[in-house]
Amino acid sequence: MEHEYPDDLRYLDSHEYVRLDGEIATIGISAFAIEQLGDIVFLELPEVGEAVEVGESFGHIESVKAVEDLYPPVSGTVIERNEAMIDSPELIGDDPYGEGWLLKLRVVNPDNELDDTLTADEYRSQVEGEA
């Protein structure tokens, strides 16, 4: 199945994405990851005010098939979490790049944060190899 990977996002090889708007980062998971997980039944995210660091899990997503840790593409402080997705995680797949976002962070260092992320084309090539 072919998925959309918006060009204005950056991706991790673990399937999280980030949209950076100045010092505010919106984080979610890709359509490919959602398809691989299947029906999502539970989502655990950090509280507003908590710090998240690149390379350290900030929560997890649970489906009928698996439980996966979530990793932030950027470091920062949580300024908002998508309570609608926590309450109804099965809706994440309806609009993963819009209403299905997970966290918003105030980024520590916006200029250097995207160094270890993939462009949409790089990510598309990677997931086509996994499918």
UniProtKB/Swiss-Prot annotation:
BP GO terms, sorted: glycine decarboxylation via glycine cleavage system
Gene3D superfamilies in the record: 2.40.50.100
Domain Lipoyl-binding: 24-106
Domain of life: Bacteria
Keywords carried by this UniProt record: Lipoyl
A GO CC annotation given for this chain: glycine cleavage complex
Cofactor note: Binds 1 lipoyl cofactor covalently.
Nucleus listed as a keyword: no
Assembly behavior: The glycine cleavage system is composed of four proteins: P, T, L and H.
Family: Belongs to the GcvH family.
Chain's role: The glycine cleavage system catalyzes the degradation of glycine. The H protein shuttles the methylamine group of glycine from the P protein to the T protein.
Official protein name in the record: Glycine cleavage system H protein
Species annotation: Gloeothece citriformis (strain PCC 7424) (Cyanothece sp. (strain PCC 7424))
